Amino acid sequence: MAKKITALIKLALPAGKATPAPPVGPALGQHGVNIAAFCKEYNAKTTDKTGLIIPVEISVYEDRSYTFILKTPPASVLLANAAKIKKGSSTPNRVNVGSITKSQLEEIASIKLPDLNTTKISSAMKIVEGTARNMGISIVD
């Protein structure tokens, strides 16, 4: 018989830099999860993606064991890295803060494809393009 899930915790943590300090400690501690073991496991799985924010979905079972699934980095983080900017525009319709090429857009869309509700790369590109527009990033050919 399958173990019963008691909690589903969603966190967005820097790759390879999870520590027992907040937000990890309090989120996992209240469910009785071994925080140090989770941090060690998460850091080991994300060392190759240093510098990115990696969302994680943690399923906690009634015997206090857990499993976790790593998601793809947020499109906004990938777009900011591609455009070499720190943050998006405060007025995206008026002020452009950077630009990316169509090939960079396609690369980001292919990275995000597993987490999006589409299977076509063209649809994924439109989704990521909308995020870019809302950040004040223009797409050039």
Swiss-Prot record:
It comes from the Eukaryota. GO terms for cellular component: chloroplast; mitochondrial large ribosomal subunit. Signal peptide: none annotated. It is found in: Plastid, Chloroplast. The keyword Electron transport does not apply. Pfam families: Ribosomal_L11, Ribosomal_L11_N. GO terms for biological process: translation. Its main location: plastid. SUPFAM superfamilies: Ribosomal L11/L12e N-terminal domain, Ribosomal protein L11, C-terminal domain. GO terms for molecular function: large ribosomal subunit rRNA binding; structural constituent of ribosome. Keywords: Chloroplast, Plastid, Ribonucleoprotein, Ribosomal protein, RNA-binding, rRNA-binding. NCBIfam families: L11_bact. Forms part of the ribosomal stalk which helps the ribosome interact with GTP-bound translation factors. Belongs to the universal ribosomal protein uL11 family. Part of the ribosomal stalk of the 50S ribosomal subunit. Interacts with L10 and the large rRNA to form the base of the stalk. L10 forms an elongated spine to which L12 dimers bind in a sequential fashion forming a multimeric L10(L12)X complex. This is Large ribosomal subunit protein uL11c. The gene is rpl11.
